[in-house]
Amino acid sequence: MANGGGGGGGSSGGGGGGGGGGSGLRMSSNIHASHLSLDASSSSSSSSSSSSSSSSSSSSSVHEPKMDALIIPVTMEVPCDSRGQRMWWAFLASSMVTFFGGLFIILLWRTLKYLWTVCCHCGGKAKEAQKINNGSSQADGTLKPVDEKEEAVAAEVGWMTSVKDWAGVMISAQTLTGRVLVVLVFALSIGALVIYFIDSSNPIESCQNFYKDFTLQIDMAFNVFFLLYFGLRFIAANDKLWFWLEVNSVVDFFTVPPVFVSVYLNRSWLGLRFLRALRLIQFSEILQFLNILKTSNSIKLVNLLSIFISTWLTAAGFIHLVENSGDPWENFQNNQALTYWECVYLLMVTMSTVGYGDVYAKTTLGRLFMVFFILGGLAMFASYVPEIIELIGNRKKYGGSYSAVSGRKHIVVCGHITLESVSNFLKDFLHKDRDDVNVEIVFLHNISPNLELEALFKRHFTQVEFYQGSVLNPHDLARVKIESADACLILANKYCADPDAEDASNIMRVISIKNYHPKIRIITQMLQYHNKAHLLNIPSWNWKEGDDAICLAELKLGFIAQSCLAQGLSTMLANLFSMRSFIKIEEDTWQKYYLEGVSNEMYTEYLSSAFVGLSFPTVCELCFVKLKLLMIAIEYKSANRESRILINPGNHLKIQEGTLGFFIASDAKEVKRAFFYCKACHDDITDPKRIKKCGCKRLEDEQPSTLSPKKKQRNGGMRNSPNSSPKLMRHDPLLIPGNDQIDNMDSNVKKYDSTGMFHWCAPKEIEKVILTRSEAAMTVLSGHVVVCIFGDVSSALIGLRNLVMPLRASNFHYHELKHIVFVGSIEYLKREWETLHNFPKVSILPGTPLSRADLRAVNINLCDMCVILSANQNNIDDTSLQDKECILASLNIKSMQFDDSIGVLQANSQGFTPPGMDRSSPDNSPVHGMLRQPSITTGVNIPIITELVNDTNVQFLDQDDDDDPDTELYLTQPFACGTAFAVSVLDSLMSATYFNDNILTLIRTLVTGGATPELEALIAEENALRGGYSTPQTLANRDRCRVAQLALLDGPFADLGDGGCYGDLFCKALKTYNMLCFGIYRLRDAHLSTPSQCTKRYVITNPPYEFELVPTDLIFCLMQFDHNAGQSRASLSHSSHSSQSSSKKSSSVHSIPSTANRQNRPKSRESRDKQKYVQEERL
């Protein structure tokens, strides 16, 4: 068998030298017999292809040449010469000579250049001096030869620079050519690496014919390209030395020259071609050039993977080389046959420190390399692999892009995304009472959701999707398809410690979204009223196109202010704008009637053409009696097509075609009756459920109509100026103005602000409104509003202007304004005073709401309402303690005791009575805000409204209730009674505004007292109200509706109070006085047969027609402005229109005989009261 191999070797060597070759090969066959079978097939093919002797010599025996070739070590096939000499050193030497030769030349050039610079340093200085000395003769042309020489040098430098710049452009990724070249080089490097993987199955060194080996030809073409690219890089390099030592350069040194050597020697050496794997490190750069990688996480992930894999493959290539070759000092005798992929496996188990032992290094070089590699490899494995797994695990969970569903709209919700905010939003947005919610909700937040929030998303997976990202990043906005979204809703953190910072964050979100897509509709929550002005600075912000800012401070304090005028109104309004399911209770308890009202919400619908030409009260009565709907407002188009929302406008206004009505109903389907109603078809129908689309309506629908389904839902194109009133004079016979000059006095006196919407006075210094405790006690305040405020110099501002403005609305006469007394820290109130100094009848008592002496000084037992606010709530981390100050103050007031005799004495003394006010008994007024008990001897009976941050803290306000701590806020007794208010109830306004943008306008009209966009722009400029002269235009703005409470105990409706029907009261009040009733404020225990001492009341919203009334009920109503209330209060009609805020003191004729005896008392006191209050208004 050995002799046959020798013959083959001789044949390959050529001619008669075959025998010698065979004998030489037989010696090595005795040593490596165990490895010979691996190369049998390859040696035979190589032998036959390279033979140049006679055919008989090459084909004498087929079996023996194979066996003779198998004697050669696995590192080489049949040698390409007669001696079987290895040539690996030639390949390695080519790389070493190239590297060190080039390095030597670079260093030599630098040395010579340095020496030249040092030697010529003095000569250079002499030339510079010569230039300076000859500077004056330059104009005469004496330096022309020098100039020509300098130009030649400059041209040479310019040519070299141009070549260098051209080479830099060619390899730069800034240009298209450069990017193509860079990507091509990387792709060819990977191709060369693949060729290495293919060749690794062959012996380390083998004979190859360049003209017949296809892979060698491809590899040669690749390396020629690498050589050209290397030249470009060398030319473009600024520092040639550092370029020579770069990793990519070293890769080229050890891979390119050996290919040329292999062509020359007609043999191949696998060698260091594995270094091409180091090119994988640039993989992330290539993907960035192609704009495939854009996020930091993806770039980091690809970087880690490329470094890890390139290091792994390169190290495996080195082990493969040394293990298959053996140690040179051992004459390559200790080699072992390992495939490249076995080496890859070996390196992985080595890095992971597992080390199974099935594959291991035998050579000294291999083991020495493993010793050093295991140190770095272990560190890399331990750090890179966990990070890679973490990036892969987190990357795809909430990444990706939103895929829009055809025929289905989607909205984007961002901002403060937490379990509480999202659950409240989804509960209201996806409520079953909403008609056909075919909207998908896409949440975008930069923090991944926790487990609870994730579970919430999964429960609503059919309509909710979450994506991790930021609205400040245009890439993330593109992912959620913001350009095709129906709207973008931004939630605010109501409990943040710095409200201004939170508002600034949301304003930046608005700017980012509008910058990306100016036409997107945005609804955002704002915490502070003064920050709304910054939204006006955004060019693409347009409230006419549906953009809205829901200011929580403005609405929260507006709700509370309305409760000062009609206690319980805050609860009723909050329930109307929230979606609540109907909860049926069979037992005859107060909860039964309360929950029946809670199920009512606010809806809009276009009115049927059957109502065209009818007056508003007529349509309102018809809707209530026949359709079982309560209409409280309409959208009115004036002659110039300007749209306004009018609340209970009165009988002078006629319904137009296409009028939008605002209804209170239990669901959206009921409101459709107002659109489907037809007098011809439905006039005799008694069951409102049978009022459906009739044949007449179908004929109308076939004709062109201006009412689109989208308008019915959102009415986006008919945005009106919020709170603006029609500039029309009332023509109701009961409301004919007598002599306006009596009430408005001299038109040259500024009594109202420039818009005519609020009472105004000249700015006052805070020192002039501060009362000491003794001054407050001597003043004997009565029928006023006490505002207990907790705050200090470092507290965030609440924005008390939003509380005062509704109480100073111009649709009150001056004598009807309630005096406001602030009790709190003077340091805090000084910070708020700049926004309050233009309002009349405001006083400050420095102190603390927890001091009973301060509370007694302001006669808290005689106040119409006590408001408890805190500016320190968000500075406490423990949510259960956030409301501690308000709760303590409330409990403190409720535990106070008062002497009735002192109260009666004070009420009849020369105490506080603003000019023109009647001191009549409040208990017999037909219209008043809160039916005061004959006397208050305990603090429990004092009307209080407490602001809470944490809903669960409501359980601490009433010690005698049985509310469960887990009960929702709207189901608790304090909220139902109107004695507690939490800002969380305003969350529902986000979804309500989205579905109907007129809803926010309506609620702001109701609670702010008449704030308009013009007024907001003015406040944004000056941060204060500007006084204006009384003109017919501004005075016409006073003619608007307001909320009041109607007492049934006595007065024109006393006959209905005892067992009458609510529907009869509704119709009588509407027909007789244009008063629109919409709810009842009833004693909690009124349903009990036995009399109770409990004075707590609860709210009943929109009771049915047949609902039975009791004498102690107070009726919520929308009252017209009474022009004559400022002149005369001697008629019944005027008393029915007097304000509930002034009814406790004046503005009505009462039925008790003692009234006449008291009529002269205000006149006798007027001069004394003016000294303290009227004079303040004129300062």
Swiss-Prot record:
Lipid linkage positions (S-palmitoyl cysteine): C119, C120, C122
InterPro entries (alphabetical): Ion_trans_dom, K_chnl_BK_asu, K_chnl_Slo-like, NAD(P)-bd_dom_sf, RCK_N, Slowpoke-like_C
UniProt keywords, alphabetically: Calcium, Cell membrane, Endoplasmic reticulum, Ion channel, Ion transport, Lipoprotein, Magnesium, Membrane, Metal-binding, Palmitate, Phosphoprotein, Potassium, Potassium channel, Potassium transport, Transmembrane, Transmembrane helix, Transport, Voltage-gated channel
Residue segments, region Segment S8: 614-634
Binding site for Ca(2+): Q955, D958, D961, D963
Residues recorded with modification Phosphoserine: S708, S721, S725, S921, S925, S1164, S1167
Superkingdom of this protein's organism: Eukaryota
Protein name, entry field: Calcium-activated potassium channel subunit alpha-1
Residues recorded with modification Phosphothreonine: T706, T913
Extracellular side, ranges: 1-87, 201-215, 262-265, 323-336, 360-368
Intervals of motif Selectivity for potassium: 353-356
Subunit structure: Homotetramer; which constitutes the calcium-activated potassium channel. Interacts with beta subunits KCNMB1, KCNMB2, KCNMB3 and KCNMB4. Interacts with gamma subunits LRRC26, LRRC38, LRRC52 and LRRC55. Beta and gamma subunits are accessory, and modulate its activity. Interacts with RAB11B.
Gene: KCNMA1
Region named Heme-binding motif: 678-682
Ranges of Basic and acidic residues composition bias in the record: 1163-1179
Native organism taxonomy: Eukaryota, Metazoa, Chordata, Craniata, Vertebrata
Compositional bias segments (type: Low complexity): 41-61, 1129-1154
